[in-house]
Amino acid sequence: MEYEYPIDLDWSNEEMILVINFFNHVEKYYESGVTAGDFMDAYKRFKEIVPAKAEEKQIFNTFEKSSGYNSYKAVQDVKTHSEEQRVTAKK
């Protein structure tokens, strides 16, 4: 699937990589599954770059329009699992 990641050009290269890494974890959550601990680590790094809820919501909406993947729902679901547990949107 081809789509663009929501990137702020004011971010450093490292910050862009960390944001893309988080969205890669969202993709894995929907496509094949991801370990809850790994997903939450990527989300925590994302939050260091995007601490404001309003900006997070805007970025999540942009990503969902591009990819069809709801990052908010993924985060909420993963939060309910233990770190070692493998989580997927596929039931």
Curated annotation (Swiss-Prot):
Family: Belongs to the UPF0223 family.
SUPFAM superfamilies attached to this UniProt entry: BH2638-like
Organismal lineage: Bacteria, Bacillati, Bacillota, Bacilli, Bacillales
Protein name: UPF0223 protein SAR1071
NCBIfam families on file: PRK04387.1
Source species: Staphylococcus aureus (strain MRSA252)
Coiled coil region boundaries: none
